[in-house]
Regions:
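NAD(P)+-binding Rossmann beta1-loop-alpha1 motif at the extreme N-terminus of oxidoreductases
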Residues: 1-54
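N-terminal start-of-chain detector that recognizes signal peptides
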Residues: 1-3, 58-59, 86-88
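Generic serine detector
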Residues: 2, 13-16, 28, 63, ...
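Conserved N-terminal Rossmann-fold NAD(P) cofactor-binding segment
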Residues: 34-83
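Generic alpha-helix signal with a bias toward terminal, lower-confidence helices
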Residues: 26, 43-44, 53, 60, ...
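Rossmann-like NAD(P)(H) cofactor-binding subdomain of soluble oxidoreductases
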Residues: 68, 75-135
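A sequence-composition feature that detects small, non-aromatic residues
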Residues: 12, 19, 25, 38, ...
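Short, surface-exposed, polar/charged, turn-prone segments marking secondary-structure boundaries
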Residues: 25, 36-38, 57-61, 101-103, ...
Length: 135
C-alpha cells in the first residue's frame, strides 16, 4: 500500500465494522463517540465479532492486533480538516446532540470528502412512500 489514509468516523457502534476493515488495510481511524466509550476504546481497543464463511460461530477481530491505528474522541476534540475522509455512522437523532451538531457544521466547512452509512433510509425519503406513517 503506497498511501495510508486518515479517516474520521462519527459513531462507534455502526462505525466499528468499517473502522476494523480500514485498520486491516493499514489506515488510521478515529471514532467519534461518548467520553466513556472513547476512554474504553483508547484503553482497550475495539473488538468486532462476526461470522466468517467456512468457520463455525463468530470470529473476533481485535483492533490492537491490526496494522492500522485506532483512536477515539469526543465531538469537541476533533478537527475534520485533519482527515482524508469523514464517515457518518450515527442514527439520525444523535446528530442533534450538543457537540455533534457543531461537529457536523465543521465537517461541512472542512470540504473533506464525506460518506454516510445508514441503517435505514432518511425520513424525507420514507415520507414519499404511500401509506407509511413517518410521524
Amino acid at each position: 500500500m503506497s498511501r495510508k489514509y486518515n479517516t474520521l468516523i462519527l459513531g462507534a457502534s455502526y462505525g466499528s465494522l468499517l473502522a476494523i476493515k480500514l485498520l486491516l488495510a493499514g489506515h488510521s481511524t478515529k471514532l467519534v463517540c461518548l467520553p466513556e466509550e472513547a476512554d474504553l476504546i483508547n484503553n482497550e481497543g475495539q473488538r468486532v465479532r462476526m461470522p466468517a464463511r467456512g468457520r463455525e460461530g463468530l470470529i473476533e477481530i481485535d483492533s490492537r492486533k491490526l496494522p492500522g491505528t485506532l483512536t477515539a474522541a469526543t465531538p469537541d476534540a476533533v478537527n475534520p480538516a485533519d482527515f482524508d475522509l469523514i464517515v457518518l455512522a450515527m442514527q439520525e437523532p444523535q446528530y442533534r446532540s450538543p457537540g455533534v451538531r457543531e461537529l457536523l457544521d465543521a465537517v461541512a466547512k472542512s470540504r473533506v470528502p464525506c460518506m454516510s452509512i445508514m441503517n435505514m433510509p432518511p425520513l424525507p425519503y420514507l415520507r414519499r412512500i404511500p401509506g407509511l406513517d413517518c410521524d
